[in-house]
C-alpha cells in the first residue's frame, strides 16, 4: 500500500469513527432494558452517513462538502417511496450496490429489510431524534462552519455555545460540537 493510499485510509477510518460518534450523540441509548430499537436507529443513521461519505469519495456522484450536512442526512433518512408495499425502495437502492467491503448495507438492513411494524418502531425512534434537523435555524447553523476542530486546542481558546435551556432537543448539537474537540 502506498503512502498516499495509507493516508487516505487513515482519514477514512477517522471520518468513520467521527460519524459513529455523531450517530451515538443523535440517537443515544437511553433504554438500558431494551436498547435494540435505539441501536437499530443509530446503526441506520450511521449507515446513511457512511453512504454519504462513500459518495463524497466519487466526484461524479455530487456529494460535495457543502451537501454533506444534517439537513440532507435527515432528508435521506425520512424519504419514503409512494409505493405502500415498498416505501424503502429508493433507500435500498441508494445503500445497495456498494463496494463489497462497505458496511452500509449491513448497518441499514435491520431497519429497511424488516417487517413493516418493526421498521415503523425503528423509524419512530429515529424520527423523534432527527426532527431537530427540520428546524431552519439548526439547518443553517449545521450547514457550514468556519471552525477547524483539528487545531482548535493548539492554543487557549474559548468556545461559547448558546443553547436555550428550554429547547432540550437542541442539546445534542452542543454535545456533538464539544465531542468533536476531543
Q: Whereabouts are the PLM-identified features?
A:
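P-loop NTPase motor domains
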Residues: 1-182
Amino acid at each position: 500500500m502506498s503512502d498516499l493510499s495509507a493516508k487516505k485510509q487513515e482519514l477514512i477510518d477517522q471520518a468513520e469513527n467521527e460519524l459513529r460518534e455523531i450517530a451515538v450523540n443523535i440517537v443515544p441509548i437511553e433504554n438500558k432494558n431494551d436498547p435494540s430499537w435505539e441501536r437499530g436507529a443509530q446503526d441506520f443513521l450511521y449507515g446513511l452517513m457512511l453512504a454519504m461519505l462513500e459518495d463524497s469519495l466519487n466526484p461524479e456522484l455530487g456529494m460535495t462538502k457543502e451537501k454533506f450536512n444534517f439537513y440532507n442526512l435527515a432528508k435521506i433518512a425520512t424519504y419514503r417511496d409512494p409505493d405502500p408495499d415498498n416505501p424503502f425502495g429508493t433507500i435500498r437502492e441508494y445503500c445497495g450496490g456498494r463496494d463489497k467491503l462497505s458496511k452500509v448495507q449491513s448497518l441499514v438492513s435491520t431497519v429497511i429489510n424488516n417487517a413493516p411494524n418493526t421498521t415503523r418502531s425503528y423509524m419512530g425512534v429515529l424520527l423523534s431524534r432527527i426532527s431537530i434537523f427540520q428546524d431552519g435555524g439548526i439547518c443553517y447553523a449545521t450547514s457550514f462552519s468556519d471552525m477547524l476542530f483539528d487545531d482548535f486546542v493548539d492554543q487557549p481558546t474559548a468556545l461559547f455555545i448558546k443553547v436555550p435551556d428550554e429547547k432540550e432537543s437542541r442539546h445534542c448539537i452542543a454535545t456533538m460540537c464539544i465531542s468533536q474537540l476531543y
